[in-house]
């Protein structure tokens, strides 16, 4: 059974119906429609925690999708899966690729910052205070850019920047 027919969630069903209508109505190529269909199936599988299936759909969408902006969201979602699986290095690679195609993707900037912050915390636990400071500075840089792009989305990050004295260079 196709993934789109397995959704039990009202919002997922609504999204699927609207997406199907848009695919039929909008003047897009068959390739673009296929890419979107794989992307949509990937999102659905990801929401259900079916990461292997989601990745298969995202990779297929990447093979078909030519638009850089659309590819950025596919790459971002692949990064999310790797983050969920604890594969932070791989996640960073995908977030960076997403940002190359869409520098305004604040959620990718935020997720990169979260990973650097997490690594900074790990460095502290391992007694590597100098390394932790470098990692925290990287996190701060990415959070500042995310906040610049989406000022109301990252309140916790903004508070962390204020509390740690790293708010310089950001108009608030």
From Swiss-Prot:
It is found in: Plastid, Chloroplast thylakoid membrane. SMART domains: TPR. It comes from the Eukaryota. Its main location: plastid. Disulfide bonds: none annotated. GO terms for biological process: photosystem I assembly. TPR repeats lie at residues 35-68, 72-105, 120-153. It is a peripheral membrane protein. GO terms for cellular component: chloroplast thylakoid membrane; thylakoid. Pfam families: TPR_1. Keywords: Chloroplast, Membrane, Photosynthesis, Plastid, Repeat, Thylakoid, TPR repeat. HAMAP family: Ycf3 (MF_00439). Belongs to the Ycf3 family. Essential for the assembly of the photosystem I (PSI) complex. May act as a chaperone-like factor to guide the assembly of the PSI subunits. This is Photosystem I assembly protein Ycf3. It comes from Chlamydomonas reinhardtii (Chlamydomonas smithii). The gene is ycf3.
